[in-house]
From Swiss-Prot:
Part of the ABC transporter complex LolCDE involved in the translocation of mature outer membrane-directed lipoproteins, from the inner membrane to the periplasmic chaperone, LolA. Responsible for the formation of the LolA-lipoprotein complex in an ATP-dependent manner. Residues 6-231 form the ABC transporter domain. One of its GO terms (biological process) is lipoprotein localization to outer membrane. It is found in: Cell inner membrane. This is Lipoprotein-releasing system ATP-binding protein LolD. ATP binds at G42, T43, S44, G45, S46, G47, K48, S49. Gene3D superfamilies: P-loop containing nucleotide triphosphate hydrolases. The lineage of its organism: Bacteria, Pseudomonadati, Pseudomonadota, Gammaproteobacteria, Alteromonadales. Belongs to the ABC transporter superfamily. Lipoprotein translocase (TC 3.A.1.125) family. The gene is lolD. It comes from the Bacteria. The complex is composed of two ATP-binding proteins (LolD) and two transmembrane proteins (LolC and LolE).
Amino acid sequence: MQDVLLQVQAVSKSYHDGDVTTQVLTEVDLQVFKGEQLAIVGTSGSGKSTLLHIMGTLDKPSAGKVLLAGEDLYQVSSARQAQIRNQDLGFIYQFHHLLPEFSALENVAMPAFIQGTDRAQAQADAKMLLERVGLGHRMSHIPAELSGGERQRVAIARALINKPKLVLADEPTGNLDAKSGEAVYELIRELANQLGTAFVVVTHDPKLAARMDRQLTMKNGYLQAVAEHAQ
C-alpha cells in the first residue's frame, strides 16, 4: 500500500469581481503518494496551475483542505506556511526565476542559506546537486551566461537543495525547445527515482505526461480522469 504524502480534499477556488464570480476549481479531490511522479494536463484556463499553486500554499482555496503529511496547510500560521514552502516543498516554474547577479552555485544554495544551513554545507550541497544535473563545470556562471536548458537545470537543483518531500513544477519545459525539454523531463524522472522525492508536474504536453507514474486531466476546473501508467 502506497503512503499518501499530500491530500487535496474537495478544493474549490473562485474569484470575485463586483457581481461577477469566476469559478476556477470545483471540488477537486486527489492524493499524491510518496516518491511518485504525477502529471496534471489540461488546456489553458482549465485550472491546473491554480491547483498547483494551492497545493504549494501560494494561493488560498475558497473551500476545501490541503494536507501535507497530515498537516492542514491552511490551518497554520503564515510563518509556518513559509517554513513548509522552504523546507518541505520545492518549486520549478516555466521561467527559471534565477537571481541574475548570482552564480549558479549561489542560486542553488540560496534556499539553504534562508533555512539557516551553514554556508559551507549549503555550498557543498549545491555543488553536489549541480554535478548531479550535469552542470559541475558551470557553477560559477551567472544565468545570462547559461542556455535556457542549463538555467532550468539550475532551477531544478535549487528546488531540491533542502531535500523537500514534494516538488511542484509548473510547465517546467514550456519555455524550452523540444530537445532541451526532453532532457529536463528525463532529469526530473531520474532525480525522482534516485532521491525518492515526489514530483507534481503541470504540463500541456500529453506525450511527456504519459511518462509519469500517473496522469490527471483537468477541464473547466474539474478533475476529469486519472490515468495509471505502466512502469
